[in-house]
């Protein structure tokens, strides 16, 4: 779990997301409150419930990007799901309890990686010994093994093929499939590899010819897992999920039953009803054991273009007490998105063209023109926020991207006149599109 202060979390989000200070503050405080609760002792710690968040804002203003960056910051089990993927219990499709099962899988993966890092040195030695056995045989003299070990560590044997027995190779290619609507202990998914593992010798494995370079990763995984207690990993992961798990529920506005609209749209409100106990706190059965959701933090977000937050069930609104509105982006915001963010679109474009030997530079007035065109098209057609910049920039760079392999060594300067010339047709099409039914 992260120990960053709210100010540090906001500062980290500022590197990638322009504006939206209220939303950043809300998620930073919520994340810090996870740490604060861990410092409490006794019954009070159990009583402190997370304050779930509802983020409201137009598409392309940074809601989903906040969740992506938060996932990297959280250092805790984090799951981002779209509310539209789920259906009411009893209908074909995934029920909302699958959210918790998926979160547990994420938690186990995190905990396993953490434990593997703690035994990395021992696993490295064991993997190296197995590769040496495959190269020179287990009966080789110590001098021979030392000689080959030096060459192995120097990378001289990376391309040499060896025959190794890797666990699970017999069933590695077998898929998982879901059983729609299968509730409770069956967990809705069957892994054919697990089912047929013993029958096909999946645990024993079978000899495979593989290069030394490619053998390192699977051997490290195998040797690490031999040193780990899987039951302990599962118990610790479930505890981590229950105490520090975070679920980001995107597109929550799409499951609103819109006012005055009836008909066969039964699963929308049903999904909301199914979410109620999950967000309030319930126990979900997973294949690893029961998981309590009382202290899992839920962050819901939606554009609410067609529906309104008040169209959500009142009970669901009550379970999302912190409401944050994200502002639409302005010309200045677009300009900052293009220039200030850590991996801005302009930096990406320049780096991509540099791989072809073409040096692309954007003048300040070109950046202003790109921002202005994006805002104009958003206002005249459909406001899709910062995503519009990708459309505009691709149109501007279209000719350069196509001819880049033939223009290696050139320096291309893009100014406002070039931008206007390239996007003129885009603006005209936007104007015409208003009159087409």
Curated annotation (Swiss-Prot):
Pfam families: AAA_2, AAA_5. It comes from Methylobacterium nodulans (strain LMG 21967 / CNCM I-2342 / ORS 2060). Gene3D superfamilies: 1.10.8.60, DNA helicase RuvA subunit, C-terminal domain, P-loop containing nucleotide triphosphate hydrolases. This is ATP-dependent protease ATPase subunit HslU. ATPase subunit of a proteasome-like degradation complex; this subunit has chaperone activity. The binding of ATP and its subsequent hydrolysis by HslU are essential for unfolding of protein substrates subsequently hydrolyzed by HslV. HslU recognizes the N-terminal part of its protein substrates and unfolds these before they are guided to HslV for hydrolysis. A double ring-shaped homohexamer of HslV is capped on each side by a ring-shaped HslU homohexamer. The assembly of the HslU/HslV complex is dependent on binding of ATP. The keyword Chaperone applies. InterPro entries: AAA+_ATPase, ATP-dep_Clp_protease_ClpX, ATPase_AAA_core, ATPase_dyneun-rel_AAA, Clp_ATPase_C, HslU, P-loop_NTPase. GO terms for molecular function: ATP binding; ATP hydrolysis activity; peptidase activity; proteasome-activating activity. It comes from the Bacteria. SMART domains: AAA, ClpB_D2-small. Belongs to the ClpX chaperone family. HslU subfamily.
């Amino acid at each position: 779990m992260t120990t960053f202060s709210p100010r540090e979390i906001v500062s980290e989000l500022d590197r990638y997301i322009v504006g939206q200070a209220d939303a950043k503050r809300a998620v930073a405080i919520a994340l810090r409150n996870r740490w604060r609760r861990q410092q409490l002792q006794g019954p009070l710690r159990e009583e402190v419930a997370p304050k779930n968040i509802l983020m409201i804002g137009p598409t392309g203003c940074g809601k989903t990007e906040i969740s992506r960056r938060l996932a990297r910051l959280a250092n805790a089990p984090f799951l981002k799901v779209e509310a539209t993927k789920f259906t009411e219990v009893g209908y074909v499709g995934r029920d909302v309890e699958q959210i918790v099962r998926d979160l547990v899988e994420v938690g186990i993966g995190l905990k396993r990686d953490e434990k593997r890092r703690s035994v990395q040195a021992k696993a490295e030695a064991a993997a190296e010994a197995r590769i040496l056995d495959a190269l020179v045989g287990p009966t080789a003299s110590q001098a021979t093994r030392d000689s080959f070990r030096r060459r192995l560590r120097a990378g001289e044997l990376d391309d040499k093929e060896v025959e190794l027995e890797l666990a699970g190779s017999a069933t590695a290619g077998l898929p998982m499939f879901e059983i729609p609507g299968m509730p409770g202990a069956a967990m809705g998914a069957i892994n054919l590899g697990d089912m047929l593992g013993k029958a096909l010798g999946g645990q024993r494995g079978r000899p495979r010819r593989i290069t030394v370079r490619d053998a390192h990763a699977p051997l490290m995984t195998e040797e690490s897992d031999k040193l780990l207690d899987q039951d302990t990993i599962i118990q610790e992961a479930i505890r981590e999920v229950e105490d520090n798990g975070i679920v980001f529920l995107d597109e929550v506005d799409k499951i609103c039953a819109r006012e005055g609209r009836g008909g066969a749209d039964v699963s929308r409100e049903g999904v909301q009803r199914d979410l109620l106990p999950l967000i309030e706190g319930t126990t979900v059965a997973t294949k690893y054991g029961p998981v309590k959701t009382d202290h899992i933090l839920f962050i819901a977000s939606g554009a609410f273009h067609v529906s309104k937050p008040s169209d959500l069930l009142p009970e669901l609104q009550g379970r999302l007490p912190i409401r944050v509105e994200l502002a639409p982006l302005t010309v200045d915001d677009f300009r900052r998105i293009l220039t200030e963010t850590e991996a801005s679109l302009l930096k990406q474009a320049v780096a991509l063209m540099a791989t072809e030997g073409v040096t692309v530079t954007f003048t300040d007035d070109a950046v202003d023109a790109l921002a202005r065109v994006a805002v104009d098209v958003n206002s005249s057609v459909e406001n899709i926020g910062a995503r519009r910049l990708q459309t505009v920039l691709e149109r501007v760079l279209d000719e350069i991207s196509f001819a880049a392999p033939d223009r290696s060594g050139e320096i291309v300067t893009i100014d406002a006149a070039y931008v206007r010339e390239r996007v003129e047709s885009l603006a005209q099409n936007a104007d015409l599109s208003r009159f087409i039914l």
